[in-house]
A protein has these predicted regions:
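Short amphipathic beta-strand segments in non-cytosolic proteins
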Residues: 52-65
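Sec-dependent N-terminal signal peptides
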Residues: 5-13
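Glycine-centered loop-to-beta-strand initiation motif
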Residues: 67-76
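Beta-strand-rich domain onsets/edges
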Residues: 19-37, 59, 98-103
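Short solvent-exposed capping/turn motifs at the termini of beta-strands
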Residues: 40-44
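Short, aromatic- and glycine-rich surface loops/edge beta-strands on solvent-exposed regions
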Residues: 81-93
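Short beta-strand/loop motifs in extracellular/secreted proteins, especially
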Residues: 49-51, 83
Length: 104
């Protein structure tokens, strides 16, 4: 019985380490020309190519939809209203960036 518990504990520990080894990374900056560029990837070195991106207003309405390019970036025209950017990396990897936090 104790051996089974040890095996199960080791399997769960390995699974937890595997899950933690793959965190999403996304950062956005203001280009100074009325556009915003976001760059993304994963902590294990994986690219963000094709990762869905959304720009939402403060009420949650989608203003812009797209995906990370083959360079793992996403550029859009800065909305005239308050907004947030959403990086949807799958498997619970969602990053939201408030437009007020985006700087040049």
């Amino acid at each position: 019985m104790n051996r089974q518990l040890v095996v199960i504990a080791l399997l769960l520990a390995g699974l937890a380490a595997r899950v933690q080894a793959h965190n999403a990374i996304c950062d956005c900056y203001d280009n100074g020309d009325n556009t915003i560029t976001c760059e993304g990837g994963f902590s294990d070195g994986g690219t963000a190519v094709g990762v869905p991106m959304r720009v939402l207003d403060e009420a949650g309405k989608v203003l812009i939809e797209g995906a990370m390019s083959d360079r793992s970036d996403f550029t859009f025209t800065k909305p005239d209203v308050g907004f947030r950017v959403e990086f949807e990396g799958g498997d619970g990897h969602v990053i939201q960036i408030d437009g007020r936090d985006i700087e040049e």
